[in-house]
């Protein structure tokens, strides 16, 4: 029998869902549809768009700065995804062992994730420039300095968050399986690669998805740490799109086309990555 509260929820659920649904329509769906439409137009405001067909997409794909930003973001995402997940998993594995102070270490490793991105960037800007100053260099002296500076910053910020997810996964592992492996004579390497990692695929799927999408969406750290210097050589996709839209007169449509391409790219890569890791999760 359905309770009175259950009957009330069934009767009025639409009323409670309406504010969230309206916010989704107004805040996401309508701007998204308008953005896709304007990517095919030449415009200065959203009301004066003139249809241009695929011209904006052609200009975007021929823009050398955009292609360089694509390569920069791709390389950055590959490096940070590997580094963050490997280190976060290793730390999580160590902290799930019976070691003294493990709770304190978990808090310490997670703390960088609580600091705002812009503030964190300026802290690391001072630190990295202070080190490079010994050789008469600055973070914006070469694109490679900016690249590795961003890698260090983002890894330091996100490792703690991914560590928490891995710790939750490790603590949920069935102990009877691990005990059976030990009884059968499996060594540490065999236990890790044939039992623990396959069973950890749900956590690996989540963490790899987050690091891949965060890598491509990098903006505030890129803006504050290098601002694309030198000569836009350390500029990621998000920063390039923003500068195209707001900084190049008459290129608003091209900037919008870049944003649509960016959305498609991240969505496709995220779906492929999720499919690959999920298939291993099912097989495990």
Positions of predicted regions on the chain:
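A structural signal for multi-pass alpha-helical bundles of membrane permease subunits
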Residues: 6-284
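Short, intrinsically disordered terminal tails adjacent to the first/last structured region
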Residues: 1-4
